[in-house]
Amino acid sequence: MNVSLKINLEFPAAIYFQDTLQLNRYTVALELCTATQDHEQINVAMARIKAFVYSELADTVFINQQDAERANILEVMGINVTTLPEDPIDQIIGLMLYCKINAVVEGRMLVEALDISSFIGDEVTYLYNAGDPIGPFQQDGWWFNADTSHNELSGIGIDQNIVHVHAHNWNKYNLNWNDVDYSKTSKTVAFGKRSDHAK
């Protein structure tokens, strides 16, 4: 028997819009329906939603992905960045959450409705129901990935030819599915320097 649930989420973040950084706070209400009878997988799905919102998106800077140079500068400075296909207004952030949350739960649950409001948005609530058009999120992007990614920045460091490859799987939260084998990946790759003993 499938079960309908409602989750309320609240998290701080910022937006970079019109060359200005503005602090904001978001309130999100999710209506979900379970799609499996496996209670352990339902618990993992719920925990993934909370981990993504409270640990990955909290204190992020939402920015239009067209402003790639600014986004990369922010990331090099150590700032948590989330890129979006359009300007970071509440409606776009809500659509992103709808797509990404459906992705991270990988069919164990379904998002049936999502409401979002924010402090900057003057507490106006945007409503989204399953089946509504997803607009700019029809294009391929990280919002369809089941991992914890929330941007597609290069991750290239500014010193010593180092690339920092972020591990976006669920290992760090211990939230993998019990029937899937996830491999661990290295986080740092050196390039551009010839080995001293290479001929």
Write out the residue ranges for each language-model feature.
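Short, low-complexity, polybasic intrinsically disordered segments
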Residues: 116-156
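Histidine-centered catalytic/metal-coordination loop motif
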Residues: 8-99, 103, 180-199
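Short acidic, gly/pro-rich beta-turn/loop elements at beta-sheet edges
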Residues: 38-40, 107, 124-126
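Charged, low-complexity, helix-prone segments enriched in Lys/Glu/Asp/Gln
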Residues: 7-9, 130-131
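Short, Gly/Pro- and small/polar-rich lid/capping loops
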Residues: 1-3
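Short, surface-exposed ligand- or partner-binding patches at beta-edge/loop junctions that are enriched
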Residues: 104-118
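Intrinsically disordered, low-complexity charged/polar segments
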Residues: 148-199
